[in-house]
């Protein structure tokens, strides 16, 4: 079994940064590639112009700002990566990308930014573990 293609979902938490660092190290050994995924909330469609466009711009700006440290990490380590910013519930989007791209592994943090959900694992991580079409490596 060759592990070459990894998905790293991120949310700005320390846990997802640890997962990204681990994935970067792993790709050194496997000559692998990473798909970096960030999922944001749906655009507020009830807003009219110009408020709708302003909301889109703010969400896009926030998304780019959030994933910038991960971009810098992968560029600094010479890790081959692509990125996707998606408007969808994170567990569904993560599993769909993993399935569509035929990824070898999902590498994700054990918890997100909301530490109240879940006892041992974050709720997103729990759902991905149950729905994923490939192995999931959970990093603490």
Language-model regions, residue ranges each:
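Conserved beta-strand positions in the Rossmann-like core of class I SAM-dependent methyltransferases
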Residues: 35, 82, 137
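Structural beta-alpha unit
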Residues: 1, 72-106
